[in-house]
Amino acid sequence: SIVVTYWDKNKNFEPIGIMTNFSELNLIIKKLKINGIDTLDNIISGRGVYKLTQTAHNEHPEIEDIQSRGHKNDVGTGVFGKLENIIFFKDKPNDGRKYTKVLGLLDKNREYFWVDTRYITHTPDYTKFKVVLPKANGTGLLEDKPSMMIGAPLVLEPFVAFTETFISIGAFDNEEEAHNALKYIKSKFARALLGVLKVTQDNPKDKWKLVPLQEFNSNSDINWTK
């Protein structure tokens, strides 16, 4: 094919940058850049933030042989199946030890398992409320239902961890703020801006960098009760 390009050498234009088929979205994106607005990716975790500790390996050396090569510390998507009844338990053991509740997948279903608290690292949001959602789900099509674009997000209470299947949003002091954040990411506005960069199933934090960050408490100019 042949491409013919025209330009006006007497004018200086701004770079096109990110462009969509929707004029409203293009205007919002332009305002974000001009005003330097904080965006949601600043409070989203990366993938695989929880890891197995050296204590877990010291007390259960068989873990290294079971885990994939080079990933001995990963709390991966299949960890419940691999390490069930070794360090992860469906029912909380009654042995006097302190255990951490972990959200993950088993046979493609969401499940909670328990692990000795000494066996898993703790992140800054571990003691806080947070919103978790699948790291990969659906597409970025604006026609997608919320569940197709962002999966089925939920609020996790403090002292609950999660496997690499999920990423988390925020580290909130109270449950109300977390539920307000949940409402926001399910809104058409947030999903539309997410869809600008999310064109595949992958849903890492950098795909959210066009979604404006909001105040999720009572100081917000948004009425979260609606």
Where is each model-derived feature located?
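C-terminal substrate-recognition regions of SAM-dependent nucleic acid methyltransferases
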Residues: 2-225
